Amino acid sequence: MKRERLMSINKEKAEAAIYQFLEAIGENPNREGLLDTPKRVAKMYAEMFAGLKKDPKEEFTAVFTEHHEDVVIVKDISFYSMCEHHQVPFYGKAHIAYLPSDGRVTGLSKLARAVEVASKRPQLQERLTAQIADALVEALHPTGVLVLVEAEHMCMTMRGIKKPGSKTITTTARGLYKEDRSERQEVMALMTKV
């Protein structure tokens, strides 16, 4: 398995902040169980935010002309992200549909990579959905794009209203799928079909 390149963070600053946070909540950062916690948490954040300085459209390195003019759908792309409001995870699945223009298609894994890059940063689900769609539009110039993201937010599960299992669904449509409701509904039905 290829090792993921981690975002370059100011490790010392991150570790010091985590150390201070542990003190702020009344913990002893020098006790045995917490000695390496600042280092571990800083490393985790470097992984969680590895997409922060990347552009999802740059993941579309493989573009082919296949004279395919019908919809391409990739469903159930799992992702994890971090809510920028509460700094707790949200996770779920992205479903992506695009209608090629002039036969321009991309490798299917590139769609999953774009989701990965866009999700690995402090994020809002609404923005995540739009960033995925916009990356595809910029890279392939398709006739239409539809992205549906469904996710469970730990800020609704662990705190506040405490409603585990609740899902948030967001969509972003571009091109034909924004302009033509019947086309959008047809593709949406395919995306959500079990």
Curated annotation (Swiss-Prot):
- Could you provide one GO biological process annotation from this protein's UniProt record? one-carbon metabolic process
| Zinc as UniProt keyword | yes
Does the keyword field hold Nucleotide-binding? yes
**GO cellular-component term (any):** cytoplasm
Its annotated pathway? Cofactor biosynthesis; 7,8-dihydroneopterin triphosphate biosynthesis; 7,8-dihydroneopterin triphosphate from GTP: step 1/1
Look up the EC number in the record and give it. Answer: 3.5.4.16
What Pfam families does UniProt report for this protein, alphabetically? GTP_cyclohydroI
Return the SUPFAM superfamilies for the record.
Answer: Tetrahydrobiopterin biosynthesis enzymes-like
Q: Which of this chain's residues are annotated to bind Zn(2+)?
A: 83, 86, 155
Which reaction(s) does the protein catalyse, per the Swiss-Prot or TrEMBL entry?
GTP + H2O = 7,8-dihydroneopterin 3'-triphosphate + formate + H(+)
Q: Which GO molecular function annotation, any one, does this entry have?
A: GTP binding
Supply the alphabetized keyword list.
Answer: GTP-binding, Hydrolase, Metal-binding, Nucleotide-binding, One-carbon metabolism, Zinc
Entry-linked Gene3D superfamilies: 1.10.286.10, 3.30.1130.10
InterPro entries for this protein: GTP-CH-I_C/QueF, GTP-CH-I_N, GTP_CycHdrlase_I, GTP_CycHdrlase_I_CS, GTP_CycHdrlase_I_dom
Instruction: State the similarity comment.
Output: Belongs to the GTP cyclohydrolase I family.
NCBIfam families to which the protein is assigned, alphabetical: folE, PRK09347.1-2, PRK09347.1-3
What quaternary arrangement does the UniProt entry report? Toroid-shaped homodecamer, composed of two pentamers of five dimers.
Question: What's the protein called, per UniProt?
Answer: GTP cyclohydrolase 1
Organism per entry: Streptococcus pyogenes
